[in-house]
Amino acid sequence: MVVRAYEERDLSGMIRVWNEVVTEGVAFPQEELLDETAGAAFFAAQTHTAVAVDEDGHTVLGLYILHPNNVGRCGHICNTSYAVGSERRGQHIGEQLVLDSLKQGKAHGFRVLQFNAVVESNTHARHLYERLGFTQLGVIPGGFRMKDGHYENICPY
């Protein structure tokens, strides 16, 4: 597996993985699925978008987007979102994406990486972030509406 900046040829695989996570309704705040046009614009608008691809470089296993979390005096803080295809979860792809995003954030002049909306029940992500040295900043009670309509806490890191 290799993590690299995305290329146009990756878009269909990226959209597939992104939409899978959106459809699951338990991790991303987005509700609208991306089509090819919207996906191309969305991923291009990020400060950095990267993919994890298999050794042949053609199959997208996961991805992340990186962008400013705020502006002005807080513009040195970035935010990321990670997505790994369900068939490849549990293979440390997410960890490689997080580690690459830390390097890319620094390369793009950011000093801090903040995760805004980690759903409390997303124990795999929370464990990974804590293992990599991130600290939970608090709890936003009922901050995330799950696909089935109930609300869960958000744990920013």
Regions found by a protein language model. Give the residues of each.
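Conserved GNAT acetyl-CoA-binding A-motif
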Residues: 105-118
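A short beta-loop-alpha structural element at the N-terminal edge
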Residues: 2-14
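Conserved active-site tyrosine of GNAT-family acetyltransferases
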Residues: 129, 134, 157
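Terminal substrate-recognition subdomain of acyl/acetyltransferases
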Residues: 82, 140, 146-157
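Conserved acetyl-CoA-binding loop-helix of GNAT-fold acetyltransferases
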Residues: 90-107, 126-131
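Acetyl-CoA-dependent GNAT
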Residues: 8, 27-87, 98-99, 104
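Helix-loop element at the rim of GNAT/NAT acetyltransferase active sites that forms part
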Residues: 16-32
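Conserved beta-strand-loop-alpha-helix junction that forms the acyl-donor binding cleft
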Residues: 89, 115-125, 143-147
